[in-house]
Design a protein with these regions (language model features):
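Short Pro/Gly-enriched beta-strand edge/turn motifs at strand-loop
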Residues: 8, 20-25, 122-125
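Charged, gly/pro-rich active-site loop segments
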Residues: 2-5, 75-158
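Short beta-strand segments
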Residues: 21-54
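Broad gene-expression machinery/nucleic-acid interaction feature
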Residues: 23, 36-38, 67, 91, ...
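Extreme N-terminal tail/first-helix region
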Residues: 1-19
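A short mixed-secondary-structure module that forms the rim of ligand-binding clefts
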Residues: 42-78
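Short, intrinsically disordered, mixed-charge
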Residues: 19, 61-68, 115-122
Length: 158
């Protein structure tokens, strides 16, 4: 990280940010072209969990190349100055690189979907999706090999 003064190295802070995130941006490479999507997410303490339709471009790309870069941010605030030169943004962000795996086991898929559900909608009861509905959903686990966190003009929330 270029600006070491912005780096957050406390792994507990990183875990809390991942445990609060409901949306993330997932970047991948389609041949020689970049491709980026916003996805709902959840954190099980080891993997970032993602879900989406069981077919489509992003899944085709990930089957060919499962490497991803993920970005999560929170507390984003634009700061306006008297001139354009004085404008900036304050934020806390997490960037991670890793490898996606497709969750195929129905039990694991249901568990992961409930992790995402509870993270995005706290307090809602577990949902038991029927097999037919489960077949229409892709669940992905991102195993990170690198994570970094940056806080610029903001303090990570407890």
């Amino acid at each position: 990280m270029r600006k070491k003064e912005c780096e957050v190295t406390d792994t507990a802070v990183l875990q809390r940010i991942l445990g609060r995130a409901t949306l993330c941006r997932v970047a991948m490479v389609d041949g020689s072209e970049p491709y980026l999507v916003t996805m709902n997410c959840g954190w099980d303490g080891e993997h970032l969990l993602l879900h989406g339709a069981a077919q489509g471009r992003k899944l085709d790309i990930l089957r060919a190349n499962p490497r991803v870069c993920v970005e999560i941010d929170e507390d984003v605030q634009l700061v306006f100055g008297a001139t354009g030169e004085e404008c900036t943004a304050n934020y806390v962000s997490v960037i991670g690189t890793g490898t996606v795996s497709f969750v195929l086991d129905p039990r694991t898929k249901r568990r992961d979907l409930n992790v995402i559900l509870h993270q995005c909608h706290p307090g809602v009861p577990d949902e038991v999706l029927p097999d037919e509905a489960l077949s229409r959903v892709a669940v992905l686990e991102v195993q990170f090999d690198h994570l970094s966190c940056k806080a610029k003009g903001a303090t990570p929330r407890p």
